[in-house]
A protein has these predicted regions:
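Condensing-enzyme catalytic core mediating Claisen C-C bond formation in acyl metabolism
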Residues: 1-38, 133-191, 195, 271, ...
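Short, conserved beta-turn/loop elements at beta-strand boundaries and strand-helix junctions
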Residues: 399-405, 450
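Short aromatic-glycine-enriched beta-strand elements
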Residues: 404-416, 457-460
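OB-fold/S1-family single-stranded nucleic acid-binding modules
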Residues: 446-469
Length: 469
């Protein structure tokens, strides 16, 4: 039996109401902060999916996106490093298609069937942009999902998968484009989305001897709410009872991540014995039949979709949204000098910077970050072991507010964090409202982008107010 053994999702804490984008807009969508991108969100989703698991058991990491920060540099290897996976594993980018996440899941199942791997982490993430004033601007949102695929302790069995392709230009973005493009919406939806989904779903269900009444929940990628309801009704589903809410009104369309996020949302409400039809779309379809097992009970309470949707803040205004997305540029502040990164130093300190390793004294147990050669408590020398701090929570010991350093993050909150496991680190706080910051508040770690210069994205860990109690 091969299937899903764990899952995790990440939806940015920030939302923007569509009314703020254009008068009359309904609902809201998720927005990545200025220091987030598809890679940082993939790390967060992956960390959530690995909670309680032995990370050395992961044999491969597949990262799917249409908005990778790097075009020539493997993004999956950076995610694997940040998530703290062992180095002798297969890492792969699955790029340039909205069904990259489901394609990666199919590849993972085939690798496991072939005996090339036992446990594979699949993560999908996107930060797509629609041009200002367009319908796509209202729909496109940010988020990430992650699934662990394996053959032991399976919570959701993957019974069957089929794939089709449909060669037509409907949604696209060329190499030099910042915004995704589309054209005649009626033609695109009828000849592209609806026909492809109907064909893939009917072929798969017929091959498995299933009818619509045999499906507990249909999880169908949706470019918008109306088209999803239309295609679900044509397949024969009761839209209100059998179809997963596409979350367009509260989340938006998260692109490559959408099929994984919607599946995770469905699994959070599923019970053993449920059968799920899972369909993604992008120049064709991937469709799968999934069966929920008793193992789903072991995954209750994970950081998934519902907890992320309940934890939210609102972007101040549309101008701030445009600045975060790099569409508008604000003048550099007087206290923010040009920044550079030393590639040699980054390579040398990658475990400290990317994996966020501290050191623990073998003599007295004192934890230090950054790692040191001499223990500050017992003064023993060179007797340390590594400890991962990226998945540790902590409390805010003290902080300062800087109102001039960074125009995109006013004020910059420099924080001193005491980890619950021991040790202390000085970190920048993000995703905050300055008036809500208090000594002793709970914080958690988040992988973020510090700056971009000379084609290099410089990443490090920050702290954020805890989104869970």
């Amino acid at each position: 039996m091969i299937g899903i053994t764990s899952y995790g999702a990440y939806i940015p804490v920030w939302r923007i109401k569509r009314e703020a984008i254009q008068r009359g807009g309904a609902g809201e969508k998720s927005v990545a902060n200025f220091d987030e991108d598809s890679l940082t969100m993939a790390v967060s989703a992956a960390v959530n999916s690995l909670a309680g698991l032995e990370r050395d058991s992961i044999d491969s990491l597949l990262f799917a996106s249409t908005t990778f920060p790097y075009k020539e540099r493997q993004n999956a290897s950076l995610v694997a490093a940040a998530v703290d996976l062992r180095k002798n594993i297969l890492t792969m980018d699955v790029a340039n298609t909205l069904r990259g996440g489901t394609g990666a899941v199919r590849l993972a199942t085939d690798l496991i069937k072939a005996g090339s791997a036992r446990n594979i982490l699949v993560t999908a993430s996107d930060c797509r942009l629609g041009a200002p004033g367009s319908t796509l601007e209202h729909l496109c949102s940010d988020g990430a999902g992650a699934l662990v695929i394996g053959s032991t302790d399976v919570a959701v069995e993957i019974e069957s998968i089929c794939s089709t392709y449909n060669e037509m230009i409907d949604i696209w973005r060329a190499d030099e484009d910042k915004f995704i493009r589309s054209w005649d919406e009626r033609f695109v939806q009828s000849e592209g989305y609806i026909n492809s989904v109907l064909n893939a779903a009917s072929v798969l269900m017929k091959g498995q001897g299933l009818e619509a009444k045999d499906i507990t929940k249909a999880v169908i990628y949706a470019p918008d709410q109306r088209r999803m309801e239309e295609v679900a009704a044509k397949i024969g589903f009761d839209v209100k009872r059998q179809v997963q809410n596409p979350l367009i009104s509260v989340l938006g369309n998260t692109g490559t991540a959408s099929p994984l996020i919607l599946l995770i949302a469905a699994l959070e409400d599923s019970k053993p014995g449920d059968r799920i039809l899972w369909v993604s779309y992008g120049d064709g379809c991937d469709a799968g039949i999934l069966r929920v097992t008793d193992g789903i009970e072991e995954l209750r309470g994970r950081k998934g979709v519902q907890t992320s949707l309940e934890s939210k803040r609102y972007v101040k205004d549309y101008v701030t949204y445009l600045e975060w997305k790099g569409i508008l540029r604000r003048e550099r502040g007087p206290g923010k000098p040009l920044q550079e990164v030393s590639l040699t130093a980054l390579w040398r300190d990658w475990e400290e910077v990317i994996r966020f390793y501290g050191s623990r004294c073998k003599s007295c147990g004192t934890i230090q970050y950054p790692p040191q050669r001499v223990c500050t408590q017992c003064h023993d020398r060179d007797r340390f072991e590594k400890i991962r701090l990226s998945d540790q929570r902590g409390k805010l010991f003290t902080f300062s507010l800087d109102y001039i350093s960074d125009p995109l993050d006013v004020p910059v909150v420099l924080s001193v964090v005491d980890f619950d496991c021991g040790g202390r680190a000085v970190l920048t706080m993000t995703d905050h409202h300055a008036k809500e910051i208090k000594i002793g508040m709970a914080v958690e770690m988040s992988f973020r982008k510090l700056f971009f210069n000379d084609g290099i994205h410089n990443y490090f860990w920050k702290c954020t107010p805890s989104r869970t109690s």
